[in-house]
Design a protein with these regions (language model features):
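Secondary-structure capping and boundary motifs in well-ordered enzyme cores
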Residues: 9, 68-71, 98-101, 139, ...
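Active-site recognition of the HExxH zinc-binding catalytic motif
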Residues: 114, 214, 218-248, 262-269
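Glycine- and acidic
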Residues: 159-166, 212-220, 244-251, 312-317, ...
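Long, amphipathic alpha-helical stalk/connector segments used for oligomerization, subunit docking
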Residues: 274-338
Length: 338
């Protein structure tokens, strides 16, 4: 974590580095190199892909005024730390001014980049190239109706389990840490090329395939939250560790897209982590690692992680209603860009 007094200087350094990157991407030399290699019809596919990536970055950066680009880099560096403090204090107003400035900046960037139909198209194209708001609206509408209809059907049939008894899924943090370590080892995460840490919010950080940091978070009163956080981020970590090291230094040694990375995370979290086979495998070892576990039947745990019970917290959402959290965020982001 970043010590509070280190925040200001860190933001200044990131702004400086952003300026260096900006100047390099605006240089005539880079434009000349891109043009040269774009004409090489017999170039290896990795080189052609790298040239396309460099040209895309060149176009995006060159449309933004340098002062605004530097200010944005400094803003997001500071905003992340303020968000962490606001979250800890449960004080949204502390973070609100930073969020407002970020949204205003992205609106301006969308104007610089240009769009055909909606401002959010500019950001969609940046984060998921080739995707449009029109496509996403159609997909979101189909998903929304499917999820809500299925949820209502499940409600009518009655949930497979009632509300859990208070304290039933409580586990000491040390036992949860041991469980998360074991689960990552089980799915193939290479601890010689990564590590498991704790933070205020689950995430995965990767400097290279040989340095992948899975960051999880735990709830003492319900071990399932930490377990599925770890499976989710572990899926991302495996993706990062499987990137070909030969692509490093070519702007290609990173995830292909946010959607691809999240699909890997959801695969391990849900398709594997909520399967009967997974719990048949995990439960005996879990009983050894977690002597405080109050649940003595594998089937009870298996059913508990497959219940559908809406929650306001996305990280604690079940497999079905999690999708609604994503759809709501999509609609909010789209509206903010107008």
């Amino acid at each position: 974590y970043m010590p509070e007094k280190g925040l200001t200087y860190r933001s200044e350094v990131m702004s400086f580095l952003g300026a260096q990157l900006y100047e390099r991407f605006r240089s005539p030399e880079l434009r000349s190199l891109v043009d040269h290699f774009s004409r090489q019809k017999d170039a290896p596919p990795q080189v052609s892909a790298m040239v396309r990536r460099v040209e895309s970055n060149y176009i995006y950066i060159n449309k933004i005024p340098q002062a605004e680009y530097q200010a944005y880099i400094a803003l997001i560096a500071k905003a992340e730390q303020v968000w962490e403090q606001a979250r800890e204090a449960n004080d949204f107003q502390r973070f609100a001014p930073y969020l407002e400035r970020i949204v205003d900046t992205l609106r301006a960037f969308a104007g610089y980049w240009g769009y055909k139909a909606e401002p959010y198209d500019a950001l969609m194209s940046f984060y998921e190239p080739g995707t449009t708001v029109q496509q996403m609206d159609r997909l979101a509408d189909e998903l929304k109706h499917f999820v809500i209809d299925l949820f209502q059907t499940l409600q009518a049939r009655g949930m497979p389990c009632g509300e859990p008894a208070e304290g039933r899924f409580r586990l000491p943090l040390e036992e949860q840490r041991a469980l998360s370590q074991y689960v990552l080892e089980t799915i193939g995460f290479d601890f010689a090329s990564g590590r498991l840490d704790e933070g205020p919010h689950p995430t995965t950080l990767a400097a290279s395939p040989g340095d992948v940091r899975v960051i999880t978070s735990y709830q003492a009163e319900d071990f399932r939250s930490g377990l599925f956080n770890t499976l989710h981020e572990g899926g991302m970590g495996l993706y990062e560790q499987d990137i070909d090291p030969a692509l490093l230094g070519m702007l290609l040694g990173e995830v292909a897209s946010f959607a691809t990375e999240l699909a890997e995370a959801r695969l391990y979290e849900n398709i594997i982590g909520r399967s009967a086979g997974f719990w048949e495998y995990l439960f005996p070892r879990m009983q050894q690692l977690c002597p405080s576990l109050a649940v003595d039947e594998r089937e009870t745990l298996f059913q508990s992680v497959n219940q559908v019970r809406p929650t306001l917290i996305r990280n604690n959402a079940d497999e079905l209603t999690y999708i609604l959290h994503i759809l709501i965020r999509y609609e909010v982001e789209k509206d903010l860009m107008v």
